[in-house]
Amino acid sequence: AQGQEEVKFAAPFAQTPGVFASVATENDPQPVNLRVSDCTNAGFQTAMQSEEASTPGHGVERLNWVAIQSGGGTTSDGSTIRVFESSVNSTLTPVPLGEGLRGRFPTVLGQVVSVVGGDPVELRFRDLRADSIGLVVEEEQSRDPEVGHAFEKVSVFLAD
């Protein structure tokens, strides 16, 4: 991928799924964030975003992604899974783990799925407790020390 690209699902989901994506290669040594946006039940947009202090442009990279139906349930082996969307900014936001995950300290995946403002951001997990996890969107600081950021939509996957 290079620039903004549209990803279409082979078949539409019943509702907008949780989308999780990453850059899978290192063809260009310059650090880059993968931004996901415009998620619908039919697909989403991706774009690589370089550090603020870097020169524009980035080499072609391979992107990996997975889309998981929003909601929750139990797998055949008894594992609890929860996929949902939340809204998070640069202030630590506690998010409840939900029934079946309390006290289990689950596996957590997350992805920022909006682009609000032009600064590169990443989703961070902090303060895992028996009943909640703290989420925060952090800006990188290559050009300036300011890290305040507006609310972004995030997809979250929890599984025990």
Locate each region found by the language model:
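Extracellular receptor-binding modules and their adjoining Ser/Thr/Gly/Asp/Asn-rich linkers
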Residues: 1-160
